[in-house]
Regions:
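Long, non-catalytic protein-protein interaction scaffolds
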Residues: 1-266
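Helix-rich, well-folded core regions that mediate interactions or catalysis
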Residues: 287, 293-297
């Protein structure tokens, strides 16, 4: 698999950051004092290799997530920058942690001593960028209608990105060239739900029929279906998400370095999910979670 080098990762951040984001980074870190913000933003956009280091700066975290006047800059920050800062903050916090709480119910937490594995996951700049992009993509989760041919006649069907069964149903009707993208997004949804809304994933566990349909969509051999449909909800979502990412990678017509990160996360899906649990608990929900509406029951 190809790997993303520092320049490619930096460019990935630059693709998402607004000029206001870049001005915020320059202002808070004082990396670029002169000339004024527009020129500072242009300089950073032309030197994106500096962006990950600036996003990880503790002063930027305080400017975005700090209390009161410290967070005055937060109104300038895009959702992508906010999530990127949260991901880098998690990497910093995990450096001094030996255990990370795992949710055992709406209010319950049990300590799991897997912090070294989570540190290793966030040790990759490409995986940090992946998580920031994933979170930002769900601030505008898609929904609407798509066209399907039913009994030889075109029909309009409604869909929501968070409805895994309906999204998987599109695999039967879309052109073959579109299927890798749907598999990728199915994996994204499984990771997002178990990472940010694990209580919802447990409370709305898949029934045997839906689980079997999704296992079939994930190209899981039928002999494994019975065992997997009775697995705990989070375990099943983890299995499906990793499987969908692998199928997306295997079907991709061009295997780029950016897509290779998807295959990499497939092998570390549980660590990715646990990192998102930590980010949600420490950064997103304590601030009131203005970014994500809870999934509909």
């Amino acid at each position: 698999r190809k790997k993303m080098d520092a320049a490619v990762v930096g460019s990935g951040y630059a693709d998402h950051l607004t000029d206001a984001d870049l001005g915020l980074l320059a202002s808070v870190t004082q990396e670029v004092r002169e000339p004024p913000w527009p020129a500072a933003a242009a300089w950073l956009r032309g030197h994106p290799e500096h962006l990950p280091e600036l996003i990880a700066d503790p002063r930027v975290f305080q400017a975005v997530f700090g209390p009161g006047e410290q967070a005055a800059h937060a109104t300038l920050a895009s959702p992508f920058l906010i999530f990127a800062v949260a991901v880098h903050r998690a990497a910093s916090e995990l450096e001094s942690m030996d255990h990370v709480p795992e949710r055992s119910g709406p209010r319950g937490r049990v300590p799991l001593f897997d912090a070294p594995e989570l540190r290793d996951f966030l040790g990759s700049p490409a995986r940090r960028l992946f998580l920031a992009e994933l979170l930002a993509s769900f601030t505008r989760a898609a929904g609407g209608q798509y066209r399907a041919v039913v009994r030889g006649r075109p029909r309009a069907r409604r869909f929501s990105e968070l409805d895994l069964a309906r999204m998987a149903g599109q695999l039967e009707t879309v052109p073959e060239a579109d299927r890798p993208g749907i598999y990728r997004r199915l994996g994204d949804v499984a990771l997002f739900l178990t990472g940010v809304f694990p209580d919802y994933a447990v409370a709305h566990a898949l029934g045997p029929v839906s689980a079997t349909r999704l296992l079939r969509a994930a190209q899981v051999p039928p002999r494994q279906h019975e065992q997997l449909t009775t697995a705990p909800a989070i375990d099943l979502f983890e299995y499906l998400g990793a499987r969908w990412y692998r199928v997306a990678w295997s079907l991709a017509p061009a295997r780029t370095a950016r897509l290779a990160v998807v295959a990499d996360v497939a092998d570390r899906f549980r660590q990715a999910r646990r990192v998102l649990n930590h980010i949600a608990d420490r950064c997103l929900f304590p601030t009131g979670n203005p970014w994500f509406a809870p999934p509909a029951p």
